[in-house]
């Protein structure tokens, strides 16, 4: 993606992480969100006129969101609906970029599901390895790329190959590529999804402890400050612990930035005692 589309996708990615990684009580499971976003992507791919209408920069964003909600609102859950609205409201350089963004967020949602079971590393590795297997076996590659072969036959083939050998999220992602190649070769599809997985894993996760809950604005400012400090996108996992008295403690890997009142008092007492 280029220009406005790249910026819009980055903003939608951040919104998706906020909704999926830090869900509110009763929120949709991420695997359900991913499946529903894939369904919306498929519908937009099948109806180019609808895709053009939802990506038209001349149409007021609120009208496009209303149209999307009328079309998909009863088919998808609250989190998926909010992400569709985010994508529809954004500005895209190409019409196809809108549906590409929805697919990307669908992949992201499934990766979040894998992360919850501490399996996201396995999923990335399995995607890469299965992609290499497909590329190295012409008969398998041709079977998956064959447009005359019924889709369900290809899905069953994938399920047989991956059964009991891969994480369910890996199976879901490969199945998505087989059902909806979206004009890509198998190699291109695996490269796209592996790239999304790599991007997700490369982010830094900061474990933040505060005495009181942070506001959304405080979260945003802290995330931006840490991202600028480390030169990479930083996601926050925030915990509230009144015992620190005030201030904030940030841990990224082995590095700890301790700005808590409890730490300052302990340091002061130590200096006075020396």
From Swiss-Prot:
Source organism, top-level taxon: Bacteria
Subcellular location: Cell membrane
Chief location of this protein within or outside the cell: membrane
Membrane topology category: Peripheral membrane protein
Keyword Isomerase: no
Gene Ontology MF terms in the entry: proton-transporting ATP synthase activity, rotational mechanism
A Gene Ontology cellular-component term: plasma membrane
Record family assignment: Belongs to the ATPase delta chain family.
Subunit organization: F-type ATPases have 2 components, F(1) - the catalytic core - and F(0) - the membrane proton channel. F(1) has five subunits: alpha(3), beta(3), gamma(1), delta(1), epsilon(1). F(0) has three main subunits: a(1), b(2) and c(10-14). The alpha and beta chains form an alternating ring which encloses part of the gamma chain. F(1) is attached to F(0) by a central stalk formed by the gamma and epsilon chains, while a peripheral stalk is formed by the delta and b chains.
Cited function: F(1)F(0) ATP synthase produces ATP from ADP in the presence of a proton or sodium gradient. F-type ATPases consist of two structural domains, F(1) containing the extramembraneous catalytic core and F(0) containing the membrane proton channel, linked together by a central stalk and a peripheral stalk. During catalysis, ATP synthesis in the catalytic domain of F(1) is coupled via a rotary mechanism of the central stalk subunits to proton translocation. This protein is part of the stalk that links CF(0) to CF(1). It either transmits conformational changes from CF(0) to CF(1) or is implicated in proton conduction.
Protein name, entry field: ATP synthase subunit delta
This protein's encoding gene: atpH
